[in-house]
């Protein structure tokens, strides 16, 4: 334990993954000693933390032996304290404030804030005072503080992207969980992190590309926040000569907030991909309304007059082969997602084809877990109940693998549905980490349907990851929405659904 040693969540996640990768390590955590984390550690038998508080850094492992533990902890310490030994000027003090950091890097125009929620607004206000845009990675920021931050930023002509904004691509530079995408003419404004990643990677793979991707935080299009920052982002993209179409991405927004955001574009056409939302004539404030991310990307391509590849090739045949292998009692779909927006989109698709879907992040409150026997279930494994004391599953797939082992082998399971998210910040081989489990599920009699979110430029390699899944017997689809359709087609014994037009 290191009292008075704060490290941000991104660095903690990286250190946890690094320790977990060491031989002989069954579990690892690099965390701040918040009450919730201390309780989780105590549940694992690590209880002697003395007077630890939220500003104390804790490294912990469960190892096969003492040597393995020492080696893993050494690696975690090296990563967490590396910044203190790698400054260009070893005699230069590490900056303790935003102002000191700007003095060292005067050309900076964006600050990434990743501190505990109660302190996030203070840091973000400091960045605005220093003339910086803000990517606010932190969660648990009070709603009134978010509104105040965004009002101030708007008055200063700056963007506050967040809170909880994990993805942005600004001037070709990816921030947070981002992908290597080609430059193009589509500006993306997203209140959904993996939703932004899905549309930007689809547009890259279709040869279109993006100009900017601005994450605004999941609450921005709520009635309370009213689209404050999304409006400013749309105005900025509308004024950008390199942006020909604007794509708005969100889980169901407040309709009035969404309309004001769309109306903020005076010259540039807007497409709205609002998951599960409906509107008369399929239009919202004059913008085409798409109910899935796939549909949104297709609408953008058509607006630009660009061709869209066949998104259905071979899927009905693959679904038919999977149906032929199923025992009669297998009718359930089980989804295990690392991307929250992809999990939500899957529920939208499955609900239209199979009926109500149960989840820890449900479309309706009455569809919260536990689910009745045989009902479709989709889990967002990036939610707090699954990440407490351990890395996000996009960084460390081990937790998902364990949960799949527990829940995917039931005699009633027809299809297992999953995503693999590539890009900067994600695990170096996420498909490889779950391939063995997928092969075992297929051998046990169920189908596995997977989607790889990524591009050829991502460090993990899109083709490599797809091939790894296919070699394990997984049906791999060209979009996340299409994966949900294939799973539904298998469970319903209606293979043609896999290649049908969206419901």
PLM feature spans:
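Catalytic-core regions of core metabolic enzymes
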Residues: 1-503
């Amino acid at each position: 334990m290191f009292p008075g040693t704060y490290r941000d969540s991104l660095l903690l996640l990286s250190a946890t993954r690094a320790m977990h990768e060491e031989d002989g390590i069954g579990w690892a955590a690099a965390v701040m000693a918040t009450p919730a984390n201390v309780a989780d550690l105590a549940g694992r038998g690590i209880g002697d933390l003395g007077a630890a508080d939220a500003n104390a850094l804790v490294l912990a492992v469960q190892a096969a032996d003492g040597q393995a533990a020492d080696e893993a902890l050494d690696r975690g310490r090296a990563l967490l304290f590396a910044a203190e030994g790698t400054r260009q000027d070893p005699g230069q003090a590490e900056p303790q404030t935003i102002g000191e950091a700007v003095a060292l890097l005067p050309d900076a125009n964006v600050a990434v804030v990743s501190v505990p929620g109660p302190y996030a607004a203070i840091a973000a206000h400091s960045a605005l005072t220093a003339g910086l845009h803000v990517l606010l990675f932190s969660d648990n920021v009070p709603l009134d503080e978010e509104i105040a931050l965004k009002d101030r930023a708007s008055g200063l002509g700056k963007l506050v992207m967040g809170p909880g904004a994990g993805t942005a691509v600004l001037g070709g530079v990816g921030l947070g969980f981002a992908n290597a995408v080609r430059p193009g003419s589509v500006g993306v404004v997203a209140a959904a992190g993996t939703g932004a990643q899905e549309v930007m990677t689809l547009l890259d793979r279709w040869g279109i590309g993006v100009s900017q991707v601005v994450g605004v935080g999941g609450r921005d299009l709520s009635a309370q926040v009213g689209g404050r920052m999304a409006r400013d982002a749309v105005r900025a993209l509308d004024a950008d000569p390199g942006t020909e179409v604007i794509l708005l991405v969100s889980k169901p927004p407040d309709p009035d907030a969404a309309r004001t955001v769309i109306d903020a574009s005076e010259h540039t056409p807007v497409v709205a991909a609002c998951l599960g939302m409906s509107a008369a004539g399929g239009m919202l404030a004059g913008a085409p309304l798409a109910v899935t991310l796939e549909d949104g990307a297709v609408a953008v391509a058509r607006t630009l007059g660009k061709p869209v590849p066949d998104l259905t090739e071979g899927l009905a045949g693959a679904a038919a082969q999977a149906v032929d292998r199923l025992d009669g009692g297998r009718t359930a779909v089980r989804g295990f997602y690392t991307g929250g927006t992809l999990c939500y989109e899957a529920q939208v698709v499955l609900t239209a084809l199979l009926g109500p879907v149960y989840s820890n992040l449900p479309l309706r409150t009455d569809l919260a877990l536990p689910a009745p026997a045989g009902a479709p279930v989709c889990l967002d494994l990036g939610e707090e109940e699954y990440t407490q004391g351990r890395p996000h599953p996009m960084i460390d797939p081990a937790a998902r693998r364990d949960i799949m082992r527990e829940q995917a082998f039931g005699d009633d399971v027809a299809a297992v549905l999953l995503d693999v998210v590539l890009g900067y910040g994600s695990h170096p081989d996420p498909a490889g980490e779950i391939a063995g489990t997928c092969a075992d599920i297929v051998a046990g009699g169920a189908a596995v349907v997977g989607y790889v979110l990524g591009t050829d430029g991502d460090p993990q390699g899109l083709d490599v990851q797809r091939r790894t899944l296919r070699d394990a017997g997984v049906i791999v689809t060209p979009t996340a929405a299409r994966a949900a359709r294939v799973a539904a087609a298998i469970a319903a014994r209606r293979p043609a659904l896999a290649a049908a037009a969206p419901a």
